[in-house]
């Protein structure tokens, strides 16, 4: 398997730079919705939607999320590329989707992404909020 060819084939080149906010991924939402299950799980502190994309029919369920820290967008870019692979109808994608069901939250902290900050709009680091679950974003992730 040639990973460089796979990367160049499925990489979303429209997402560039370090600053990635909700508008960047919402442009793909209609495409995701038409091919698979896309839903809004809830809203952030500043009422921005938190999306979940679901694909696959396998018995093993995998939860993936990105941008828990709003200013860390690298994984979001990787998830978008991975979602492109899963929707490609390739033999690899078919085999993966037969075994697994993926639930993907491409941006957990859209308020932090908007302001390019690690924390959410209430100045809470969501990665430190798993015990208290004081923030709507943390509560959404734990549903």
Regions flagged by a language model, labelled:
Residues 14-18, 69, 127-131:
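Second-shell loop/turn segments in exported
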Residues 43, 63-65:
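Residue-level signal for helical boundary/lining positions with a hydrophobic bias
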Residues 51-59, 67:
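Short beta-strand-to-loop junctions in surface cap/lid or active-site-entrance loops
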Residues 59-63, 73-143:
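Active-site/substrate-binding loop(s) of hydrolase catalytic cores
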Residues 1-50:
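Short glycine- and acidic-rich boundary segments immediately preceding or forming the N-terminal edge
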Residues 44, 70-72:
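Gly/Ser/Thr-rich loops at beta-strand to alpha-helix junctions
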């Amino acid at each position: 398997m040639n990973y460089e060819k796979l990367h160049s084939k499925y990489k979303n080149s429209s997402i560039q730079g370090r600053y990635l906010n909700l508008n960047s991924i919402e442009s793909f939402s209609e495409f995701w919705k038409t091919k698979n299950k896309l839903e809004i799980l809830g809203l952030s502190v500043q009422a921005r939607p938190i999306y979940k994309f679901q694909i696959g029919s396998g018995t093993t369920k995998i939860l993936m999320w990105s941008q828990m820290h709003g200013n860390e967008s690298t994984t979001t870019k990787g998830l978008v590329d991975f979602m492109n692979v899963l929707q490609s109808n390739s033999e690899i994608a078919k085999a993966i989707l037969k075994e697994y069901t993926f639930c993907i939250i491409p941006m957990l902290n859209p308020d932090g992404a908007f302001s390019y900050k690690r924390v959410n709009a209430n100045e809470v680091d969501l990665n430190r909020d798993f015990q208290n679950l004081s923030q709507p974003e943390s509560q959404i992730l734990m549903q």
